[in-house]
C-alpha cells in the first residue's frame, strides 16, 4: 500500500506532465517534488511548495502556477479537497476513509509495518565503534555504538542488506603500549621498583590483566628494573619526551622478553580487553556481524596488495627513503606516507588496505562512522578510495561528536590514558540501556551532545524516553482494563466503524501513525536516525493528549472498538519504532 505522501507526489507529477504536454510548462524541467506534513491541521494533512519552486524556471507568479497545477491534478478518492494558500502553497486534505485505511494496514502487518524497499537489497557495510582494544569502552564510544546500531536497524527496515562490522586495531602502536603497561604492572607485582611511564595505560584493568598473568604464569617474565631502564631517554616528568620514552621502553621490553614473551603480554591484553568490549556491547544491545582484525591485513598480504595497487596506477613516489601516496592529486591537502624510511607501514597504509578489502567483498555502499576527532581522516580515506579506482560516492563517512556528561549541573570529567574515564558500562548501570540508547541518537551525530544524567533517570514528561515508553505502557493498561471490566473488543467491528473517529485528537493520531513509513524512509535516505527519535516523541505526545481528553472505554460498543483499533495501531507503531532504536517497550511502568 502506497503512503498518502507517495499518492500526493504521484498526483503532482501527473499534473506536471499534463501541463508540459499542453505546452503550458517547459519540457526540460528538473524539479524535485517535495511534499511535507502540514504543521497546522487547519491547513490540511499535506502541503507542497512546488509552485514556488517552479516560479523561477517558468517565469510565472507562484500563485498562478499553483492554480494551473490544481486545475489539472487527477481526481483521487483519497483526497477530499485541495486548497491554495499564501503565496502559492498547495494544501491537501485527505478523506477520513483514506486516513482510516492505515489502521487496518497496521493491524494486519504488525511488526512488519513501516518496512519498505528503498534499499532494494543493496549490500551495505557499516563500520563503527572500532575503538582501540586498549581499555574499556567509554561514554564517547557509546554514542558511536548507539548511532551505528540504530542506523543499521533503520537501513534494514528500509530494505537494505546490512552488515555491521567492528575493525579491531590489533596491530598498532597503541597495543604495544598496552602490552608494555601490563608487563610493567606485572614487574610491580614481582616487587620491582618500577616507575610507571607518563604515556602508559593506568586503568585498574591493567593491574587485573597483570595479576592474571602473574597468577597463571608466575615469575618467568621478570627482569630487574635497572635492566629495563638502563640507558633509556628521560620520560616527561624528568624533562624528556613521553612519546620517545614509551617507544624506547617498548623496544627494551621486546628485547628482554623476546618475540614470544612480548607476544604473550600482547595477546593476553588483547583478548581480555576485546572480550570485555564484546560483552559490553552485547549488553548494550549492539551486535556485530563481523569483527575484522587489522592484523589479518598483514597476514594475508592485503597491505602489500593495497600499496601495490596504488603503485600500479602511478599514484606513489619515493622521497627520503619513504614511499608516499600522491594524495594531493585527488584533493587532499598534502601527500601521505605509506611506508616509512625504516620500512614500517603507516596507519594510513592499513586504512588503504582495509577499504580495498571492503570493496573487494562486494558491498554496494560503505559507511564509516568515526569519532569527530577523526575528521582529518575523511579526505584521505576518500582520496585513497578514488585512487584505487572505486566510486567514492559509494563511501559515506559520518562523524559523531563525543558525548559530554553532566550530573547535578556539573560537567563530568573523563580522560582515557589517566584511567579516570567514565565507562559505557558505568553509564548503562546508572541510567539504563533504554535511556542511553535513546539519548545517544536523539540529536544529529555531528551536533555536540550534553548528556544530562539526572534527566535520563527522571520519571517525568521531560525525559523523552520515559515519555515514549509511558505512552506504550498506557495503551497496554487500557487493554488490561478492558478485560478487567469485562468489556469486549471486536476488531472487525472496530475496523468497520472507523468513520466514528471524528475527534480532532483522533485525526491527529491517525495522521501521525500514517507518517511512520515515511519517517523510516527519510531517516534511511539521510542516515539520520534522530528523525525517528523525534517522531516517536511527537507520537507519544499525541497519544497522551488523546488519553487525557477522551473516554477511551466508552459504553457505545462500535465507537469503543474503533478507538481500541486506533490505540492498538499506535501501540504497534511505538513498539516498532522503539525496537529500531534499541529501546524496550514496557507494558507497565
UniProtKB/Swiss-Prot annotation:
Q: Which UniProt keywords apply?
A: Aminoacyl-tRNA synthetase, ATP-binding, Cytoplasm, Ligase, Nucleotide-binding, Protein biosynthesis
EC numbers for this chain: 6.1.1.19
Instruction: Give the top-level enzyme category.
Output: ligase
Q: Which SUPFAM superfamilies match?
A: Anticodon-binding domain of a subclass of class I aminoacyl-tRNA synthetases, Arginyl-tRNA synthetase (ArgRS), N-terminal 'additional' domain, Nucleotidylyl transferase
A family per Pfam: Arg_tRNA_synt_N
Q: Which GO terms describe its biological process?
A: arginyl-tRNA aminoacylation
Q: List the disulfide bonds.
A: none
Q: Which domain of life is it from?
A: Bacteria
Name of the featured protein: Arginine--tRNA ligase
Which gene holds the coding sequence for this protein? Answer: argS
